[in-house]
Protein backbone atom coordinates (compact mmCIF):
# COMPACT_ATOMS: atom_id res chain seq x y z
CA UNK A 1 0.00 0.00 0.00
CA UNK A 2 1.43 3.36 -1.03
CA UNK A 3 1.66 6.03 1.69
CA UNK A 4 0.92 9.65 0.88
CA UNK A 5 3.54 12.26 1.77
CA UNK A 6 2.00 15.06 3.84
CA UNK A 7 3.90 18.33 4.26
CA UNK A 8 3.21 21.49 6.25
CA UNK A 9 1.28 24.29 4.49
CA UNK A 10 3.73 26.50 2.65
CA UNK A 11 6.29 23.72 2.36
CA UNK A 12 6.93 21.42 -0.56
CA UNK A 13 7.97 17.77 -0.47
CA UNK A 14 11.63 17.25 -1.28
CA UNK A 15 12.41 16.60 -4.97
CA UNK A 16 12.88 12.88 -4.39
CA UNK A 17 9.44 12.79 -2.76
CA UNK A 18 7.73 14.53 -5.64
CA UNK A 19 4.47 12.79 -6.52
CA UNK A 20 4.28 11.96 -10.21
CA UNK A 21 1.03 12.81 -11.95
CA UNK A 22 0.22 13.26 -15.62
CA UNK A 23 -2.37 14.84 -17.86
CA UNK A 24 -3.81 12.70 -20.64
CA UNK A 25 -5.64 13.90 -23.72
CA UNK A 26 -7.56 10.83 -24.87
CA UNK A 27 -8.36 12.02 -28.37
CA UNK A 28 -10.41 10.69 -31.25
CA UNK A 29 -7.46 10.65 -33.66
CA UNK A 30 -4.39 11.01 -31.43
CA UNK A 31 -3.72 10.77 -27.71
CA UNK A 32 -0.98 12.39 -25.62
CA UNK A 33 0.45 12.28 -22.12
CA UNK A 34 2.10 15.29 -20.45
CA UNK A 35 3.69 16.07 -17.10
CA UNK A 36 5.13 19.03 -15.22
CA UNK A 37 8.91 18.60 -14.93
CA UNK A 38 11.01 21.24 -13.18
CA UNK A 39 7.93 23.50 -13.12
CA UNK A 40 7.54 23.27 -16.92
CA UNK A 41 4.65 21.32 -18.44
CA UNK A 42 5.72 19.21 -21.40
CA UNK A 43 4.37 16.41 -23.55
CA UNK A 44 6.21 13.11 -23.06
CA UNK A 45 7.37 11.55 -26.36
CA UNK A 46 7.84 7.87 -27.13
CA UNK A 47 11.27 6.26 -27.52
CA UNK A 48 11.46 7.62 -31.08
CA UNK A 49 10.72 11.19 -30.02
CA UNK A 50 7.11 11.23 -31.28
CA UNK A 51 4.74 13.14 -28.96
CA UNK A 52 1.50 11.80 -30.49
CA UNK A 53 0.11 8.31 -30.08
CA UNK A 54 -2.44 7.50 -32.80
CA UNK A 55 -5.66 6.38 -31.09
CA UNK A 56 -5.61 3.12 -33.04
CA UNK A 57 -5.68 -0.46 -31.70
CA UNK A 58 -5.27 -3.59 -33.86
CA UNK A 59 -6.24 -6.90 -32.28
CA UNK A 60 -4.26 -10.01 -33.23
CA UNK A 61 -5.38 -13.67 -33.54
CA UNK A 62 -2.93 -14.52 -30.75
CA UNK A 63 -4.91 -12.34 -28.35
CA UNK A 64 -2.39 -9.51 -28.23
CA UNK A 65 -2.70 -6.04 -29.73
CA UNK A 66 -0.69 -3.42 -31.56
CA UNK A 67 -1.27 0.17 -30.43
CA UNK A 68 -0.46 3.48 -32.08
CA UNK A 69 1.68 3.89 -35.19
CA UNK A 70 2.13 0.16 -35.78
CA UNK A 71 -1.63 -0.42 -35.66
CA UNK A 72 -2.22 2.59 -37.91
CA UNK A 73 0.16 1.17 -40.53
CA UNK A 74 -1.75 -2.14 -40.51
CA UNK A 75 -5.21 -0.57 -40.85
CA UNK A 76 -5.24 -0.82 -44.66
CA UNK A 77 -4.78 -4.61 -44.76
CA UNK A 78 -6.81 -5.46 -41.64
CA UNK A 79 -9.59 -2.85 -41.29
CA UNK A 80 -12.07 -5.03 -39.35
CA UNK A 81 -9.67 -5.70 -36.47
CA UNK A 82 -8.09 -2.24 -36.42
CA UNK A 83 -10.21 0.03 -34.24
CA UNK A 84 -9.94 3.72 -35.12
CA UNK A 85 -11.75 6.69 -33.48
CA UNK A 86 -13.03 4.53 -30.61
CA UNK A 87 -13.86 7.69 -28.67
CA UNK A 88 -16.97 8.04 -30.82
CA UNK A 89 -18.32 4.79 -29.36
CA UNK A 90 -17.65 5.49 -25.66
CA UNK A 91 -20.82 5.18 -23.58
CA UNK A 92 -22.94 4.78 -26.72
CA UNK A 93 -25.43 2.16 -27.87
CA UNK A 94 -25.71 0.99 -31.47
CA UNK A 95 -28.49 3.47 -32.28
CA UNK A 96 -26.36 6.36 -30.96
CA UNK A 97 -23.38 5.80 -33.30
CA UNK A 98 -23.41 8.24 -36.21
CA UNK A 99 -22.59 7.03 -39.75
CA UNK A 100 -22.22 3.44 -38.55
CA UNK A 101 -22.68 2.20 -42.12
CA UNK A 102 -19.38 3.85 -43.12
CA UNK A 103 -17.32 1.84 -40.64
CA UNK A 104 -15.74 -1.54 -41.47
CA UNK A 105 -16.49 -3.06 -38.05
CA UNK A 106 -18.83 -5.85 -36.98
CA UNK A 107 -20.86 -4.44 -34.09
CA UNK A 108 -22.66 -6.22 -31.28
CA UNK A 109 -25.50 -4.23 -29.71
CA UNK A 110 -24.81 -5.12 -26.09
CA UNK A 111 -26.76 -3.60 -23.16
CA UNK A 112 -25.44 -0.19 -22.21
CA UNK A 113 -22.69 0.13 -24.79
CA UNK A 114 -21.94 -1.08 -28.29
CA UNK A 115 -19.28 -3.84 -28.64
CA UNK A 116 -16.96 -4.72 -31.52
CA UNK A 117 -16.17 -8.20 -32.89
CA UNK A 118 -12.46 -8.86 -33.43
CA UNK A 119 -10.27 -11.91 -33.98
CA UNK A 120 -9.35 -11.62 -30.31
CA UNK A 121 -13.00 -11.74 -29.24
CA UNK A 122 -15.70 -9.16 -28.60
CA UNK A 123 -14.23 -5.90 -27.29
CA UNK A 124 -15.95 -2.93 -25.68
CA UNK A 125 -14.90 0.68 -26.37
CA UNK A 126 -13.78 0.77 -22.73
CA UNK A 127 -11.34 -2.09 -23.34
CA UNK A 128 -10.03 -0.49 -26.55
CA UNK A 129 -9.53 2.86 -24.81
CA UNK A 130 -7.81 1.08 -21.91
CA UNK A 131 -5.17 -0.25 -24.35
CA UNK A 132 -4.38 3.33 -25.41
CA UNK A 133 -4.33 4.62 -21.83
CA UNK A 134 -2.12 1.74 -20.65
CA UNK A 135 0.39 2.54 -23.42
CA UNK A 136 0.48 6.19 -22.34
CA UNK A 137 0.83 5.20 -18.67
CA UNK A 138 3.79 2.95 -19.51
CA UNK A 139 5.38 5.73 -21.59
CA UNK A 140 5.05 8.15 -18.67
CA UNK A 141 6.44 5.75 -16.07
CA UNK A 142 9.38 4.84 -18.32
CA UNK A 143 10.15 8.53 -18.95
CA UNK A 144 9.64 9.75 -15.38
CA UNK A 145 11.27 6.70 -13.79
CA UNK A 146 8.60 5.87 -11.22
CA UNK A 147 4.98 4.88 -10.78
CA UNK A 148 2.24 7.46 -11.21
CA UNK A 149 -0.01 8.54 -8.36
CA UNK A 150 -2.72 9.50 -10.80
CA UNK A 151 -3.82 11.26 -13.95
CA UNK A 152 -6.15 14.02 -15.06
CA UNK A 153 -7.93 12.85 -18.21
CA UNK A 154 -9.68 15.29 -20.51
CA UNK A 155 -13.12 14.80 -22.03
CA UNK A 156 -15.24 16.92 -24.39
CA UNK A 157 -17.48 19.41 -22.60
CA UNK A 158 -20.54 17.75 -24.12
CA UNK A 159 -19.72 14.25 -22.75
CA UNK A 160 -22.63 12.94 -20.69
CA UNK A 161 -22.47 10.82 -17.52
CA UNK A 162 -22.31 7.54 -19.46
CA UNK A 163 -19.39 8.74 -21.59
CA UNK A 164 -17.55 10.15 -18.58
CA UNK A 165 -18.04 6.97 -16.58
CA UNK A 166 -16.83 4.90 -19.55
CA UNK A 167 -13.67 7.04 -19.62
CA UNK A 168 -13.11 6.46 -15.90
CA UNK A 169 -13.67 2.72 -16.32
CA UNK A 170 -11.11 2.61 -19.15
CA UNK A 171 -8.56 4.38 -16.95
CA UNK A 172 -9.18 1.95 -14.10
CA UNK A 173 -8.72 -0.98 -16.48
CA UNK A 174 -5.43 0.59 -17.60
CA UNK A 175 -4.21 0.80 -14.00
CA UNK A 176 -4.61 4.56 -13.72
CA UNK A 177 -5.94 6.45 -10.72
CA UNK A 178 -8.16 9.23 -12.09
CA UNK A 179 -7.50 12.40 -10.12
CA UNK A 180 -10.13 14.18 -12.14
CA UNK A 181 -11.90 14.35 -15.48
CA UNK A 182 -11.33 17.80 -16.94
CA UNK A 183 -13.32 19.40 -19.74
CA UNK A 184 -11.14 19.96 -22.81
CA UNK A 185 -11.92 23.69 -23.25
CA UNK A 186 -11.09 24.31 -19.58
CA UNK A 187 -7.80 22.43 -20.00
CA UNK A 188 -6.93 24.59 -23.01
CA UNK A 189 -7.71 27.74 -21.03
CA UNK A 190 -5.51 26.56 -18.15
CA UNK A 191 -2.64 25.84 -20.57
CA UNK A 192 -2.79 29.44 -21.80
CA UNK A 193 -2.73 30.67 -18.21
CA UNK A 194 -6.24 32.07 -18.47
CA UNK A 195 -7.01 30.88 -14.92
CA UNK A 196 -4.38 33.20 -13.44
CA UNK A 197 -6.21 36.47 -13.05
CA UNK A 198 -7.55 36.67 -16.59
CA UNK A 199 -11.02 38.11 -16.95
CA UNK A 200 -13.38 38.35 -19.89
CA UNK A 201 -15.04 36.23 -22.54
CA UNK A 202 -12.96 33.59 -24.34
CA UNK A 203 -13.85 31.20 -27.14
CA UNK A 204 -12.26 27.76 -27.49
CA UNK A 205 -12.45 26.49 -31.09
CA UNK A 206 -11.63 22.77 -31.08
CA UNK A 207 -11.44 20.97 -34.43
CA UNK A 208 -10.20 17.44 -33.89
CA UNK A 209 -10.02 14.45 -36.15
CA UNK A 210 -13.62 13.39 -35.73
CA UNK A 211 -15.44 16.09 -33.81
CA UNK A 212 -15.83 19.86 -33.70
CA UNK A 213 -16.54 21.73 -30.47
CA UNK A 214 -16.94 25.40 -29.68
CA UNK A 215 -17.10 26.64 -26.09
CA UNK A 216 -17.67 30.18 -24.88
CA UNK A 217 -16.08 30.71 -21.46
CA UNK A 218 -16.51 33.57 -19.04
CA UNK A 219 -13.56 34.06 -16.68
CA UNK A 220 -13.97 36.27 -13.61
CA UNK A 221 -11.31 35.89 -10.92
CA UNK A 222 -11.17 32.14 -10.66
CA UNK A 223 -14.63 31.36 -11.93
CA UNK A 224 -14.72 29.26 -15.10
CA UNK A 225 -18.26 29.58 -16.42
CA UNK A 226 -19.12 27.69 -19.59
CA UNK A 227 -21.62 30.15 -21.04
CA UNK A 228 -22.49 27.98 -24.02
CA UNK A 229 -21.25 25.04 -26.04
CA UNK A 230 -21.90 23.81 -29.53
CA UNK A 231 -20.36 21.90 -32.35
CA UNK A 232 -20.80 18.88 -34.55
CA UNK A 233 -19.97 15.40 -33.29
CA UNK A 234 -19.60 14.16 -36.88
CA UNK A 235 -17.34 16.89 -38.30
CA UNK A 236 -13.57 16.91 -38.06
CA UNK A 237 -10.28 16.72 -39.89
CA UNK A 238 -11.30 13.32 -41.30
CA UNK A 239 -13.98 15.05 -43.39
CA UNK A 240 -11.32 17.25 -45.01
CA UNK A 241 -9.41 14.07 -45.91
CA UNK A 242 -12.59 12.64 -47.41
CA UNK A 243 -12.98 15.68 -49.69
CA UNK A 244 -9.47 15.11 -51.02
CA UNK A 245 -10.22 11.41 -51.65
CA UNK A 246 -13.38 12.31 -53.60
CA UNK A 247 -11.35 14.79 -55.66
CA UNK A 248 -8.68 12.15 -56.37
CA UNK A 249 -11.30 9.60 -57.47
CA UNK A 250 -12.90 12.16 -59.78
CA UNK A 251 -9.64 13.51 -61.23
CA UNK A 252 -8.13 10.05 -61.81
CA UNK A 253 -11.40 8.49 -63.03
CA UNK A 254 -11.12 5.61 -60.57
CA UNK A 255 -13.58 2.75 -60.21
CA UNK A 256 -15.38 2.11 -56.87
CA UNK A 257 -12.70 1.55 -54.24
CA UNK A 258 -12.12 -1.48 -52.02
CA UNK A 259 -11.79 -0.99 -48.25
CA UNK A 260 -8.00 -1.35 -48.56
CA UNK A 261 -7.71 1.24 -51.36
CA UNK A 262 -10.02 3.63 -49.52
CA UNK A 263 -7.78 3.41 -46.45
CA UNK A 264 -4.69 3.92 -48.63
CA UNK A 265 -6.10 7.07 -50.27
CA UNK A 266 -7.28 8.40 -46.91
CA UNK A 267 -3.72 8.09 -45.60
CA UNK A 268 -2.41 9.89 -48.70
CA UNK A 269 -5.08 12.58 -48.30
CA UNK A 270 -4.16 13.15 -44.66
CA UNK A 271 -0.50 13.55 -45.58
CA UNK A 272 -1.42 16.01 -48.35
CA UNK A 273 -3.62 18.04 -46.00
CA UNK A 274 -0.81 18.28 -43.44
CA UNK A 275 1.73 19.24 -46.12
CA UNK A 276 -0.52 22.06 -47.36
CA UNK A 277 -0.43 23.65 -43.91
CA UNK A 278 3.04 24.96 -44.77
CA UNK A 279 3.28 24.61 -48.59
CA UNK A 280 1.42 25.95 -51.64
CA UNK A 281 1.10 22.55 -53.33
CA UNK A 282 1.76 18.84 -52.86
CA UNK A 283 1.90 15.67 -54.97
CA UNK A 284 -0.35 12.66 -54.39
CA UNK A 285 1.09 9.37 -55.66
CA UNK A 286 -0.52 5.96 -55.08
CA UNK A 287 -0.58 2.43 -56.51
CA UNK A 288 -3.98 0.76 -56.00
CA UNK A 289 -4.69 -2.95 -55.60
CA UNK A 290 -6.34 -2.90 -59.06
CA UNK A 291 -3.06 -1.86 -60.66
CA UNK A 292 -4.30 1.68 -61.26
CA UNK A 293 -1.87 4.47 -60.47
CA UNK A 294 -2.53 7.95 -59.18
CA UNK A 295 -0.29 10.97 -59.77
CA UNK A 296 -1.88 14.34 -59.05
CA UNK A 297 -0.84 17.78 -57.84
CA UNK A 298 -3.10 19.41 -55.26
CA UNK A 299 -2.68 23.14 -54.67
CA UNK A 300 -3.62 25.03 -51.52
CA UNK A 301 -6.08 27.07 -53.59
CA UNK A 302 -7.87 23.95 -54.87
CA UNK A 303 -7.92 22.47 -51.36
CA UNK A 304 -9.52 25.66 -50.05
CA UNK A 305 -12.23 25.44 -52.73
CA UNK A 306 -12.88 21.75 -51.99
CA UNK A 307 -13.34 22.35 -48.27
CA UNK A 308 -14.95 25.81 -48.16
CA UNK A 309 -18.33 24.36 -47.17
CA UNK A 310 -16.73 22.37 -44.33
CA UNK A 311 -15.08 25.51 -42.98
CA UNK A 312 -18.42 27.33 -43.06
CA UNK A 313 -20.02 24.33 -41.37
CA UNK A 314 -17.79 24.97 -38.34
CA UNK A 315 -18.63 28.68 -38.23
CA UNK A 316 -22.39 28.17 -37.96
CA UNK A 317 -22.14 26.51 -34.50
CA UNK A 318 -19.73 29.29 -33.46
CA UNK A 319 -22.31 31.98 -34.27
CA UNK A 320 -25.01 29.95 -32.56
CA UNK A 321 -22.88 29.49 -29.42
CA UNK A 322 -22.24 33.23 -29.28
CA UNK A 323 -25.98 33.91 -29.58
CA UNK A 324 -26.74 31.35 -26.87
CA UNK A 325 -24.20 33.05 -24.59
CA UNK A 326 -25.72 36.44 -25.31
CA UNK A 327 -22.42 37.91 -26.54
CA UNK A 328 -21.06 39.25 -29.82
CA UNK A 329 -17.70 38.67 -31.50
CA UNK A 330 -16.65 42.11 -30.23
CA UNK A 331 -17.11 40.88 -26.65
CA UNK A 332 -14.64 38.00 -27.12
CA UNK A 333 -11.25 38.84 -25.62
CA UNK A 334 -9.38 35.88 -27.09
CA UNK A 335 -9.84 32.77 -29.22
CA UNK A 336 -7.96 29.56 -28.36
CA UNK A 337 -7.39 27.03 -31.15
CA UNK A 338 -7.34 23.36 -30.17
CA UNK A 339 -6.90 20.25 -32.30
CA UNK A 340 -4.45 19.38 -35.06
CA UNK A 341 -6.94 20.35 -37.78
CA UNK A 342 -6.69 24.00 -36.69
CA UNK A 343 -3.21 24.05 -38.22
CA UNK A 344 -4.86 24.42 -41.63
CA UNK A 345 -4.39 28.04 -42.83
CA UNK A 346 -7.97 28.06 -44.16
CA UNK A 347 -9.25 27.44 -40.63
CA UNK A 348 -7.05 30.07 -39.02
CA UNK A 349 -8.03 32.66 -41.63
CA UNK A 350 -11.74 31.94 -41.26
CA UNK A 351 -11.66 32.06 -37.45
CA UNK A 352 -9.57 35.24 -37.51
CA UNK A 353 -11.97 36.93 -39.92
CA UNK A 354 -15.04 35.93 -37.90
CA UNK A 355 -13.69 37.23 -34.58
CA UNK A 356 -11.72 40.13 -36.02
CA UNK A 357 -8.54 39.09 -34.21
CA UNK A 358 -5.61 36.72 -34.55
CA UNK A 359 -6.35 33.46 -32.68
CA UNK A 360 -4.01 32.28 -29.91
CA UNK A 361 -1.68 29.78 -31.57
CA UNK A 362 1.60 30.04 -29.65
CA UNK A 363 0.95 26.60 -28.10
CA UNK A 364 0.84 23.48 -30.26
CA UNK A 365 -2.90 22.87 -30.92
CA UNK A 366 -2.30 19.11 -30.71
CA UNK A 367 -0.69 19.47 -27.29
CA UNK A 368 -2.52 22.35 -25.57
CA UNK A 369 -5.20 20.18 -23.93
CA UNK A 370 -2.68 17.65 -22.57
CA UNK A 371 -0.52 20.48 -21.22
CA UNK A 372 -3.46 22.02 -19.36
CA UNK A 373 -4.36 18.61 -17.95
CA UNK A 374 -0.76 18.11 -16.78
CA UNK A 375 -0.80 21.45 -14.96
CA UNK A 376 -4.02 20.47 -13.22
CA UNK A 377 -2.66 17.01 -12.36
CA UNK A 378 0.47 18.53 -10.86
CA UNK A 379 -1.67 20.74 -8.65
CA UNK A 380 -3.93 17.88 -7.54
CA UNK A 381 -0.90 15.74 -6.72
CA UNK A 382 0.21 18.41 -4.24
CA UNK A 383 3.42 19.42 -6.00
CA UNK A 384 4.60 22.98 -5.70
CA UNK A 385 7.74 24.62 -7.00
CA UNK A 386 9.46 27.48 -5.10
CA UNK A 387 7.62 30.72 -5.75
CA UNK A 388 4.36 29.06 -6.71
CA UNK A 389 1.45 30.05 -4.51
CA UNK A 390 -0.92 27.13 -4.85
CA UNK A 391 -3.90 27.00 -2.53
CA UNK A 392 -4.15 23.41 -1.27
CA UNK A 393 -7.52 22.56 0.22
CA UNK A 394 -8.34 19.53 2.30
CA UNK A 395 -11.59 20.81 3.78
CA UNK A 396 -14.17 23.41 2.80
CA UNK A 397 -13.15 26.52 4.78
CA UNK A 398 -16.57 28.17 4.48
CA UNK A 399 -20.05 26.80 3.88
CA UNK A 400 -21.39 26.75 0.34
CA UNK A 401 -25.05 27.44 -0.25
CA UNK A 402 -27.75 28.73 -2.54
CA UNK A 403 -30.10 31.71 -2.22
CA UNK A 404 -33.76 30.84 -1.72
CA UNK A 405 -36.93 32.98 -1.69
CA UNK A 406 -36.76 35.92 0.67
CA UNK A 407 -32.99 36.30 0.34
CA UNK A 408 -32.29 33.33 2.61
CA UNK A 409 -29.31 30.99 2.34
CA UNK A 410 -29.81 27.24 2.19
CA UNK A 411 -26.45 25.63 3.03
CA UNK A 412 -25.68 22.72 0.70
CA UNK A 413 -22.14 21.86 1.86
CA UNK A 414 -21.28 22.93 5.44
CA UNK A 415 -17.85 24.29 6.32
CA UNK A 416 -15.14 21.81 7.32
CA UNK A 417 -16.57 19.13 5.03
CA UNK A 418 -13.66 17.07 3.74
CA UNK A 419 -13.11 17.15 0.00
CA UNK A 420 -13.82 15.81 -2.53
CA UNK A 421 -17.48 16.08 -1.56
CA UNK A 422 -20.84 16.19 -3.30
CA UNK A 423 -24.25 17.13 -1.93
CA UNK A 424 -27.63 17.50 -3.63
CA UNK A 425 -30.90 19.06 -2.57
CA UNK A 426 -34.28 19.46 -4.25
CA UNK A 427 -36.06 22.78 -4.66
CA UNK A 428 -39.32 23.74 -6.32
CA UNK A 429 -41.02 26.67 -8.04
CA UNK A 430 -42.70 29.56 -6.22
CA UNK A 431 -45.27 30.59 -8.85
CA UNK A 432 -47.66 28.79 -11.17
CA UNK A 433 -46.28 28.40 -14.69
CA UNK A 434 -42.72 29.30 -13.64
CA UNK A 435 -40.36 28.22 -16.46
CA UNK A 436 -37.00 29.47 -15.18
CA UNK A 437 -35.08 29.55 -11.92
CA UNK A 438 -32.12 31.75 -10.97
CA UNK A 439 -29.39 29.89 -9.07
CA UNK A 440 -27.26 32.15 -6.86
CA UNK A 441 -24.21 30.37 -5.45
CA UNK A 442 -23.02 31.73 -2.09
CA UNK A 443 -20.17 31.22 0.37
CA UNK A 444 -20.26 32.04 4.07
CA UNK A 445 -21.83 31.31 7.44
CA UNK A 446 -24.54 33.98 7.56
CA UNK A 447 -28.24 33.26 7.18
CA UNK A 448 -29.04 35.96 4.61
CA UNK A 449 -27.68 36.09 1.06
CA UNK A 450 -26.83 39.79 1.38
CA UNK A 451 -24.35 38.95 4.17
CA UNK A 452 -22.59 36.14 2.29
CA UNK A 453 -20.03 36.18 -0.52
CA UNK A 454 -21.53 35.82 -3.98
CA UNK A 455 -19.60 33.28 -6.07
CA UNK A 456 -21.67 32.92 -9.21
CA UNK A 457 -25.12 33.17 -10.74
CA UNK A 458 -26.70 31.16 -13.53
CA UNK A 459 -30.18 30.32 -14.76
CA UNK A 460 -32.02 27.08 -15.38
CA UNK A 461 -34.45 27.63 -18.24
CA UNK A 462 -36.94 25.34 -19.92
CA UNK A 463 -38.76 24.17 -16.77
CA UNK A 464 -42.15 22.77 -17.89
CA UNK A 465 -45.00 25.06 -16.77
CA UNK A 466 -46.64 23.53 -13.68
CA UNK A 467 -48.51 24.68 -10.61
CA UNK A 468 -46.30 26.19 -7.91
CA UNK A 469 -44.50 23.51 -5.92
CA UNK A 470 -44.95 20.74 -8.49
CA UNK A 471 -41.63 21.05 -10.32
CA UNK A 472 -38.60 19.30 -8.81
CA UNK A 473 -35.25 20.99 -9.38
CA UNK A 474 -32.28 19.00 -8.08
CA UNK A 475 -29.34 21.27 -7.28
CA UNK A 476 -26.01 19.45 -6.91
CA UNK A 477 -22.83 20.94 -5.43
CA UNK A 478 -19.60 19.03 -6.05
CA UNK A 479 -16.14 20.10 -4.88
CA UNK A 480 -13.10 18.39 -6.39
CA UNK A 481 -9.77 17.80 -4.69
CA UNK A 482 -8.44 21.11 -6.01
CA UNK A 483 -11.31 23.09 -4.51
CA UNK A 484 -13.14 23.48 -7.81
CA UNK A 485 -16.86 23.75 -7.17
CA UNK A 486 -19.24 22.57 -9.86
CA UNK A 487 -22.89 23.47 -9.40
CA UNK A 488 -25.57 21.92 -11.56
CA UNK A 489 -29.34 22.31 -11.55
CA UNK A 490 -31.57 19.72 -13.19
CA UNK A 491 -35.35 19.66 -13.59
CA UNK A 492 -36.24 16.02 -13.02
CA UNK A 493 -39.22 15.78 -15.41
CA UNK A 494 -37.84 17.40 -18.57
CA UNK A 495 -34.16 16.73 -17.85
CA UNK A 496 -33.13 20.33 -18.66
CA UNK A 497 -29.85 21.16 -16.96
CA UNK A 498 -27.49 24.08 -16.40
CA UNK A 499 -24.15 24.25 -14.61
CA UNK A 500 -21.20 26.44 -13.63
CA UNK A 501 -17.68 25.84 -12.27
CA UNK A 502 -16.29 28.01 -9.45
CA UNK A 503 -13.12 28.18 -7.39
CA UNK A 504 -14.71 28.84 -3.98
CA UNK A 505 -11.59 30.08 -2.20
CA UNK A 506 -10.19 32.25 -4.99
CA UNK A 507 -8.85 35.47 -3.56
CA UNK A 508 -9.52 34.49 0.08
CA UNK A 509 -6.57 34.25 2.41
CA UNK A 510 -6.55 32.74 5.90
CA UNK A 511 -7.39 36.15 7.42
CA UNK A 512 -10.44 36.56 5.17
CA UNK A 513 -11.73 33.11 6.09
CA UNK A 514 -11.18 33.79 9.80
CA UNK A 515 -12.98 37.14 9.54
CA UNK A 516 -15.98 35.60 7.79
CA UNK A 517 -16.20 32.85 10.40
CA UNK A 518 -15.95 35.35 13.27
CA UNK A 519 -18.72 37.48 11.77
CA UNK A 520 -20.84 34.36 11.46
CA UNK A 521 -20.36 33.46 15.14
CA UNK A 522 -20.99 36.99 16.42
CA UNK A 523 -24.11 37.47 14.31
CA UNK A 524 -25.60 34.00 14.82
CA UNK A 525 -28.45 35.05 17.15
CA UNK A 526 -29.40 38.11 15.13
CA UNK A 527 -29.10 36.13 11.89
CA UNK A 528 -31.47 33.45 13.14
CA UNK A 529 -34.04 36.10 14.07
CA UNK A 530 -33.74 37.71 10.63
CA UNK A 531 -33.95 34.30 8.98
CA UNK A 532 -37.14 33.44 10.88
CA UNK A 533 -38.62 36.79 9.82
CA UNK A 534 -37.69 36.20 6.16
CA UNK A 535 -39.06 32.64 6.23
CA UNK A 536 -42.43 33.77 7.62
CA UNK A 537 -42.62 36.57 5.03
CA UNK A 538 -41.96 34.04 2.25
CA UNK A 539 -44.68 31.78 3.66
CA UNK A 540 -47.05 34.75 3.74
CA UNK A 541 -46.24 35.68 0.14
CA UNK A 542 -46.78 32.09 -0.97
CA UNK A 543 -50.20 31.96 0.73
CA UNK A 544 -51.26 35.34 -0.71
CA UNK A 545 -50.15 34.31 -4.22
CA UNK A 546 -52.08 31.02 -4.07
CA UNK A 547 -55.17 32.67 -2.56
CA UNK A 548 -55.17 35.42 -5.20
CA UNK A 549 -55.31 32.82 -7.99
CA UNK A 550 -57.97 30.78 -6.16
CA UNK A 551 -60.23 33.80 -5.68
CA UNK A 552 -59.84 34.78 -9.32
CA UNK A 553 -60.86 31.28 -10.44
CA UNK A 554 -63.55 30.34 -7.89
CA UNK A 555 -64.50 33.49 -5.99
CA UNK A 556 -68.14 32.89 -6.93
CA UNK A 557 -68.23 30.08 -4.35
CA UNK A 558 -68.16 32.68 -1.56
CA UNK A 559 -71.00 34.79 -0.25
CA UNK A 560 -70.37 38.57 -0.01
CA UNK A 561 -69.96 38.24 3.76
CA UNK A 562 -67.45 35.37 3.43
CA UNK A 563 -65.46 37.27 0.80
CA UNK A 564 -65.36 40.37 3.00
CA UNK A 565 -64.05 38.31 5.94
CA UNK A 566 -61.29 36.80 3.83
CA UNK A 567 -60.35 40.21 2.39
CA UNK A 568 -60.06 41.55 5.95
CA UNK A 569 -57.69 38.73 6.93
CA UNK A 570 -55.66 39.29 3.73
CA UNK A 571 -55.26 42.97 4.59
CA UNK A 572 -54.28 42.08 8.15
CA UNK A 573 -51.59 39.69 6.91
CA UNK A 574 -50.18 42.26 4.47
CA UNK A 575 -49.95 44.84 7.27
CA UNK A 576 -48.35 42.38 9.71
CA UNK A 577 -45.77 41.30 7.08
CA UNK A 578 -44.45 44.88 6.98
CA UNK A 579 -43.48 44.59 10.65
CA UNK A 580 -40.49 42.87 12.27
CA UNK A 581 -42.29 40.35 14.49
CA UNK A 582 -41.98 36.91 12.88
CA UNK A 583 -44.32 35.35 15.45
CA UNK A 584 -47.06 37.87 14.61
CA UNK A 585 -46.63 37.09 10.91
CA UNK A 586 -46.91 33.36 11.62
CA UNK A 587 -50.11 33.95 13.60
CA UNK A 588 -51.56 36.03 10.75
CA UNK A 589 -50.63 33.32 8.20
CA UNK A 590 -52.28 30.65 10.36
CA UNK A 591 -55.41 32.79 10.80
CA UNK A 592 -55.80 33.35 7.06
CA UNK A 593 -55.09 29.68 6.33
CA UNK A 594 -57.76 28.53 8.80
CA UNK A 595 -60.16 31.21 7.60
CA UNK A 596 -60.05 29.83 4.06
CA UNK A 597 -60.40 26.11 4.92
CA UNK A 598 -64.10 26.07 3.96
CA UNK A 599 -63.33 27.87 0.68
CA UNK A 600 -60.65 25.26 -0.10
CA UNK A 601 -63.12 22.43 0.58
CA UNK A 602 -65.69 23.94 -1.79
CA UNK A 603 -63.07 24.30 -4.52
CA UNK A 604 -62.14 20.64 -4.10
CA UNK A 605 -65.81 19.60 -4.38
CA UNK A 606 -66.16 21.62 -7.58
CA UNK A 607 -63.02 20.04 -9.00
CA UNK A 608 -64.28 16.53 -8.24
CA UNK A 609 -67.68 17.24 -9.81
CA UNK A 610 -65.98 18.53 -12.98
CA UNK A 611 -63.78 15.45 -13.16
CA UNK A 612 -66.76 13.08 -12.79
CA UNK A 613 -69.11 14.96 -15.10
CA UNK A 614 -70.57 12.65 -17.80
CA UNK A 615 -69.03 9.49 -16.29
CA UNK A 616 -71.08 6.33 -15.59
CA UNK A 617 -70.63 4.41 -12.35
CA UNK A 618 -69.35 1.37 -14.28
CA UNK A 619 -66.52 3.52 -15.68
CA UNK A 620 -65.40 4.42 -12.19
CA UNK A 621 -65.14 0.82 -10.97
Swiss-Prot record:
CDD domains: ASKHA_NBD_HSP70_HscA (cd10236). Keywords: ATP-binding, Chaperone, Nucleotide-binding. GO terms for biological process: iron-sulfur cluster assembly. It comes from the Bacteria. The keyword Aminoacyl-tRNA synthetase does not apply. Pfam families: HSP70 (PF00012). InterPro entries: ATPase_NBD (IPR043129), Heat_shock_70_CS (IPR018181), HscA_NBD (IPR042039), HSP70_C_sf (IPR029048), HSP70_peptide-bd_sf (IPR029047), Hsp_70_fam (IPR013126), ISC_FeS_clus_asmbl_HscA (IPR010236). Chaperone involved in the maturation of iron-sulfur cluster-containing proteins. Has a low intrinsic ATPase activity which is markedly stimulated by HscB. NCBIfam families: HscA, PRK05183.1. This is Chaperone protein HscA homolog. The lineage of its organism: Bacteria, Pseudomonadati, Pseudomonadota, Betaproteobacteria, Burkholderiales. The gene is hscA.
